[in-house]
Amino acid sequence: METRRMFFSRRNILKGSAASLAAAALGSSSAAFAQQSSAPTIRPLTGKMTYEEVRNRAREMMIPRCYVCPECNGRGPCIGQVPGFGGMGASRGFQANYDSLAAVQLNSRVVHGVHVPDTSIDFFGTKISMPVIAAPTGGTTYNMGGKLTEEEFVNAICGGCNKAGTLGAVADGIGDPLPVYEKRLQTLKEHGYKAIVGLKPRLQKDIIERMRLAEEAGIIALTIDLDSAGRAARATKGQTVEPKTFEQLKELVKASKLPLLFKGIMTPDEAELCINAGAAGIVVSNHGGRTLADTPGTAAVLPRIVDKVNGRCFVMVDGTLARGTDVEKYVAIGADCTLVVQSINTLSIK
């Protein structure tokens, strides 16, 4: 099958954002222990470790859950490793994310009057420095090797993202009991972090209970990754997750005063259902290829979904984001904002 390549001008992305987004979006901002360094060197944002030293440290702490490959494309030793950050089965869904994004190419525009690129956006009333937010990630014990405490992880992710001018995230991991989720929220409250929260499609009463806790913690927005109902981990004893009907989606939207985005949307018809249920937004995501094998890549399905949405809700996307140009591509083909997973998680190690 022929791969269609798409070309976009950076001039048309992010109100004239130029190549500096590549440096701003992931190279500096996603380092989870960020303290900005003005020196144009490869020293890290803390001034204590180089980027490669951080990656080596991450390998020590995350193998075999993640091997911190030079290029995170679903073709490394992590294939089929779930829990962890590998893709389901032969990891073709993970690989499709990488390949579909790689097929999008950028053209530069050199004749313009933009001297200071503005990459900031409004996220439900909160101005953030770029269309990049940490993706909610749970399970430091079973997804990340268990060598990082919950408090360390939340401080790293949310502290670094906030210093970079964007939002961190905490998650309600599918195998995490309620006290673990409460501990993460408590860390947010203690430090005053600005963040989003990702919830699992648990029983309605359990979701609403977690919504209330998130509201008390001062969260900016909520996501529910509906596709987690199809994960093997749903069989975890005492941690029930389930598919949601249209009526259940409407109930959840009404249950919280916070903006609610439904995650795991990969088709235009389900985007329409979410809009009709009253969702503030959707997240185009195949869960990193970790819920269903052989899914298409998110960059492949995003344009059709955006056409269907037609501005009626906020559209986010995730999938193998590793650098600022990846952000530019997703925004160019229609996303309002991106969620970054592994690049940020790796840089949280110190």
What are these regions (language model features)?
Residues 345-348:
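Helical hairpin unit composed of two closely spaced alpha helices linked by a short loop
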Residues 204-315, 328-329, 333-336, 342:
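Alpha/beta enzyme core
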Residues 91-177, 184:
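N-terminal functional module of multi-domain proteins
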Residues 32-34:
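Boundary at the C-terminal end of the N-terminal hydrophobic targeting segment
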Residues 138-148, 198-204, 261-266:
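Active-site mouth loops of central-metabolism enzymes
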Residues 41-129:
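An N-cap/entry alpha-helix motif that binds or orients negatively charged groups
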Residues 1-9, 19, 26:
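N-terminal secretory signal peptides
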